[in-house]
Amino acid sequence: MTAGPDPAPDTSAASSPSPVRERAESVLRVLVGRDDVALREDQWRAIEALVIGRRRALVVQRTGWGKSAVYFVATVLVREGWASWRPGRPTPAPGSRSGVGPRSGPTVIISPLLALMRDQVAAARRAGISAVTMNSANAAQWPAIEEQVRTGDVDVLLVSPERLNNPTFRDEILPRLAAGAGLVVVDEAHCISDWGHDFRPDYRRIRTLLAGLPPRTPVLATTATANARVTADVAEQLGGTAPGLRDAEVLVVRGTLERDSLHLGVRRLPDAAARLAWLTDYVRRAPGSGIVYCLTVSAAQEIAERLREAGLEVAPYTGRTDAADREQLEEDLKTNRVRALVATSALGMGFDKPDLAFVVHMGAPDSPVSYYQQVGRAGRGVDRAEVVLLPGAEDRSIWDWFGSQGFPPEPEVRAVLTALDEATREGGGPLSTNLLETVTSLRRTRLESMLKVLDVDGAVRRVQGGWESTGRPWAYDAERYARVEAARIAEQEAMERYEALEAPECRMAFLRSALDDPVMPAHWRCGSCDLCGGLVLKRAARADDVEAARASLARVGVVLTPRRQWPAGMDRLGLPALRGRIAASERAGTGMAVGRMDGLGVAAALRGLIEQDDAAEVPLGLRPSVLQVAERLTALMAEDGDDTGGDAGSDDGPPPSGVVVIESRRRPRLVRQVGRALSRHLSAAPLGVVGAAGEPGRHDVGSAFRLAQVARSLTLADWSHEALTGLQGASVVLVDDWTDSGWTLAVAARLLLRAGAARVHPFVLAQR
């Protein structure tokens, strides 16, 4: 928000600035709490375009440049009436609200993250700007906030893009806000573009919002991470559909991406243990506090646990972290109460700690743009910050998985549109997301993302109670989706080139080039990265530290929580008996997996095993882990009383008396080998195999579809009378190779319990 880590007065300003600029400078000084700062010329150019020209502007500037200063200063000027001031007239009084009126209501800021909102509200209030938020957490306060807006008591209103898709907000509140807004700000505007690294479907509605604004309503879009293609796309969306507004009238202020405080480096290490040992030593020695980024939730949780065991004050921060806990963790890092947060990309845009001293990536993001955005958290207010990438062998497979979650193929989209069209014709009312899961194989998050895109495209509409068809024709833009996919792959390849750079190449020069920095000189080198000699990284951790890390990662075992509720709408899939809560007498007990496929430690061995379609046996090195987790499951079964399937009235569970294997079409020899090994090790009788009819179903489908697949496939039809007799009252260990949705285990356990088993506890090699 300030003009730099150590901003000096801008001597390039005119010797006799206009009264508007003088007032803007005074607002900036209050905003940053210093008397020796001045607006940069490009900051002033954007403010002038917004306030005096009432134009639309896109500001693409690096983190720390002062983008929020532009819209907060512009807000004060608009609210005080400077937009209508002309030379020769009296100047508005500082702090007045003479500009408040039908055309000079509050600034509406669309901001993607609660963390970003919190920081922005705090910054605004320090400058005497009245700022409030409207989000899902304070819906009860919306009427009071609306009244404050109506009476002119609110200068800045922050809303999340998700609010734009809320029917009540979209239809009742948003039109009134848009009609009276003095300024509209789209923060983190790269999210508008589906070419961008962080495209969000909710942002697509912003284009519709902007098109409906009254003429000459100023609009500012800001981002720190946009290459030339994304910049052009966002600029087009800012101006391309506004009545009477030509694209050329969108002011684009784009600056250098150079960050001279950042010292970039890459260290390639042979395996997860070597990386963890190196990271532990680095975090222990690093000055100040920082962020350790991971690609998955499992990795973040596991690494945080290992670092804490090494005596380091760290905490995990992921998309699964409770909102209140996130706020506390952010404050802990800002005040240096923790050495580091071990985070996924959930800690990203908007987090502001000027003295953040380091950022380490345990695994590479899938694009240079995304990487630059994350490392930009460091070094904003200090002369030196270190940024280290520790690539992992699993990075590419993780990228591919996230990439597979893009816009669905046309048949999946058409299935949803057809279902909504039929519901509308038959007068059946809107369909909930739960019901739509029964007409498509898409998983919930992908389905919801697709519906948001269709909503913005005008094909469907979100209403109270679900979704309905608009009846408008809709075309599947296969060519565009193919281009986006090709761009994604190209960015992954660029990230791999970044990892492989060698001297005399320069890491910051590579990132600036990848982001199409408009002012980077030819043959420029930063002088600060490891290839330029500005950062010297320890080559490897000590051998004993690596062995300690290896021992730590060798710990295995993941608790599997059983499914407790059938998905809604199973009657639409021909399975009406599967509804509501799963009866305790038909529910699996708590189970165990040897490990997660997206974690560290045994994850690599498990991935290699599960990816073999005809794997015959567990590798020798993994067998002790399998038996160790089996013993943990036995202990868990002894402790697991009322919360297991079967005899819900007992206090303690008996030890396992039998082993049942779920038939695998892809790895039949593997699961049978595991079943035999557990039967011997646990002294539990081999009771039989849950059969699987037909071809194995897909795992990359929605919850209801996956349940329907396994419910129609799994069977005990081949069990003999003798086998069923042996099942009566048995405490069963149910063996499968891996689990994802949990429905295979739930259905198999239900079959066994209904056939007479007393308890069923799942055991799998891997959890995905």
Question: For each predicted feature, which ranges?
Answer:
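Intrinsically disordered, low-complexity terminal tails and inter-domain linkers enriched
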Residues: P5-P19, G81-S104, T241-A248, E639-P655, ...
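Active-site signature of alpha/beta-hydrolase-fold catalytic machinery across serine-
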Residues: F72-V73, L77, D233, Q673, ...
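Acidic, metal-coordinating catalytic cores used for nucleic-acid/nucleotide bond scission
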Residues: V297-S298, T321, E663-L670
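Active-site-facing substrate-recognition patch
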Residues: L262, S552-G658, P668, R672-R676, ...
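Helicase motor core with emphasis on the C-terminal RecA-like subdomain
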Residues: S18, E22, S26-L31, E41, ...
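PRPP-dependent phosphoribosyltransferase catalytic core
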Residues: A746-R768
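Mobile, glycine- and charge-enriched loop segments
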Residues: E722-L734, T739, Q767
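C-terminal accessory region of SF2 helicases/translocases
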Residues: V338, A364-Q373, G379-E586
